[in-house]
Amino acid sequence: IVYGISSFGLSQDLSITRKEAAEYIENYFETYPKIKGFLDGLVADGKEKGYVSTMLGRRRPIPELKSGNFMQRSFGERVAMNSPIQGTAADIIKIAMNRVYQRLKQEGLQSRLVLQVHDELLIETKKEELEIVSRILEEEMKGAAHLSVELDVDMHEGNSWYEAK
């Protein structure tokens, strides 16, 4: 809902009627009116400026907001709601990834950053480096952004990528 899903989209995702989905969305925003105001503000700001920005200032142009076509304009509104949130998360994980990579090099470790998927970093680590790599991950991921809430870091380990999930 926070990303601007329509009643049709929610009804498809939850296998409920469109009317039930619309009521669900309406109840959500009645319960959390500040979220509705925040999202409406993102759309209004995007219409005024022609773009939205992440917390770190990266801009996403949204020409669809000025379209005469309802479907394109609706798409633009969802982009305006979604981009600042998911874009900020993408900015933060990229900063964290760079910080972790630099620390692994700086510490002279054999562990290597292998992959980033959404908000996850995958590191191949020798068992004897597990403790220091865990500490580096926690420090550098939490330090990637200074927000009013602390970033949470979960770690999993395994002998294969599957085991570590």
Where are these regions (language model features)?
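Conserved catalytic core of nucleotide polymerization and phosphodiester-bond processing enzymes
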Residues: 1-165
